[in-house]
Amino acid sequence: MDTKTLIDKYNIENFTNYINFIIRNHQAGKGNLRFLVNLLKTTGGSNLKELDINPVEIENFNIDIYLDFLEFCLDSKFIF
């Protein structure tokens, strides 16, 4: 999945907004997204390093969106 597909699928204006959208829809207590985002911020390029992202507790976590995000990261080689 590429950035355009991801953005078009969820009507997100840009990648930064998409990351923030994911975080707003994630339960921060699970911790795995926070770890992933921190990893992305240190390995994913200057656009991610400059973000100041703090996960917030939201009860409705959409696993499909989260999995799409992970797939995008893997496809984009953000992690490895």
Curated annotation (Swiss-Prot):
Self-associates. It comes from the Viruses. The lineage of its organism: Viruses, Riboviria, Orthornavirae, Kitrinoviricota, Alsuviricetes. This is Protein P9. It comes from Lettuce infectious yellows virus (isolate United States/92).
